Structure formats: structure tokens, C-alpha cells
Design a protein with these regions (language model features):
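Mobile, glycine- and charge-enriched loop segments
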Residues: 1-15
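Histidine-anchored nucleotide/phosphate-binding helix
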Residues: 15-30
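Short, structured coil segments at secondary-structure junctions
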Residues: 30, 75, 121-122
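Short internal beta-strands
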Residues: 32-39
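Short, well-ordered beta-strand core segments
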Residues: 34, 79, 125-127
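S-adenosyl-L-methionine/SAH cofactor-binding core of RNA-modifying enzymes
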Residues: 44-114
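Structured adenosyl-cofactor binding patch, chiefly the S-adenosyl-L-methionine
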Residues: 118-167
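Long, charged alpha-helical interface segments
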Residues: 167-176
Length: 176
């Protein structure tokens, strides 16, 4: 299974930090690619710098034709839209996990008001709670549940920086 995240919309300076966090969360918790629908060189370079230093093969892509991307993706996988209006994650996650054994997953998270077409194109509209909260939180919970916690402490290949879990102090290994 390959997991990709589609960041739908991005409002320049207003969303720069949160969009970066969406991408970093996607990378850290098991996604292989993030797709932005709007170009932002600052966010892209921040994410690529993290990949360069912390390792892995995470990809950053800009695709302005998001509807076409979703339709094409559906030929090989399922589309999951994270929204507070969706079905309860606890009820639907076993089905998603079962499907993920044979299909890739595209997770859609919005930055602004999500167009009605997203709800219609998605195979699943899933809520991580029914209260307002961050798309970063929703994505983190979804990916953690999807991978059942297995991605939290994985090693990233080609990492120049690694953290060694420690109860006391900071233990950082840097490649020389």
C-alpha cells in the first residue's frame, strides 16, 4: 500500500506554517508523497530540507488539477477525505485497513472551505471527532490508526540526523 496526501488549497502566508506541518506529519507517519494544489516555494523547500536531513524518499508534488488527480488515483486506490462531517473513524477504520491490503490510499485534507465535489469524489468521508480542530491532528490520528502505530519509530534511510529515544536528555546522532 502506498499512502499519498492531497493538501487541497493553501493560502500563502496564512497557511504556510500549517501546510508545512501537514506535509511533515504525512512524511513522519507513513505517507510517501504530498500533493499541493498551489505552489509555495517556501513550504516545498522546507519539506525537501527535512527529507534531505532526516532521510526517507518522501515526495513533494504540485498538481493544480486536483479533480483529475483524484479521478486518476481512484483507478488504483481509494480516496479518503478527512472532515469533521464524515463517518466516525472508529467505525470505518477496520474497513479502510482491509482495503489497504490491496489498494493505495489518497488522503485529502483541506486548507479552506472544501468544494462539494471532494465529498462526492471521495470513497470515504471520515471524521476524526465532530468538533473543530486542526487538519494536522486529523491527519496524524488517521495515519497512526491506519498503520497501527508502526510508523512512529521507524528508521528513515539516508538520514543525516537521528533521534535516539531517551527518558532523560536529548540524544541526537548526526552523520559526519
Amino acid at each position: 500500500m502506498v499512502v499519498e496526501v492531497l493538501r487541497l488549497g493553501h493560502r500563502g502566508d496564512r497557511d504556510k506554517r500549517i501546510s508545512t506541518h501537514v506535509a511533515l506529519t504525512a512524511r513522519a507517519l507513513g505517507a510517501e508523497k504530498i500533493i499541493f494544489t498551489v505552489e509555495d516555494e517556501h513550504v516545498e523547500s522546507s519539506v525537501k530540507k527535512v527529507v534531505e536531513n532526516w532521510g526517507g524518499n518522501f515526495k513533494f508534488v504540485v498538481e493544480k488539477h486536483w479533480k483529475r488527480y483524484i479521478r486518476e488515483f481512484k483507478k488504483r486506490g481509494i480516496v479518503v477525505h478527512l472532515t469533521m462531517y464524515g463517518a466516525n473513524i472508529n467505525e470505518i477504520m477496520p474497513e479502510i485497513r482491509e482495503l489497504s491490503k490491496e489498494k493505495d490510499i489518497l488522503v485529502v485534507v483541506g486548507a479552506e472551505k472544501v468544494p462539494k465535489e471532494v465529498y462526492e469524489l471521495a470513497d470515504y468521508n471520515i471524521s476524526v471527532g465532530n468538533q473543530p480542530h486542526s487538519e494536522v491532528a486529523a491527519l496524524a490520528i488517521f495515519l497512526d490508526r491506519l498503520f497501527e502505530g508502526k510508523t512512529l519509530y521507524r528508521d528513515f534511510e539516508n538520514a543525516k540526523i537521528k533521534i535516539v529515544p531517551s527518558n532523560h536528555g536529548k540524544v541526537v546522532i548526526r552523520e559526519k
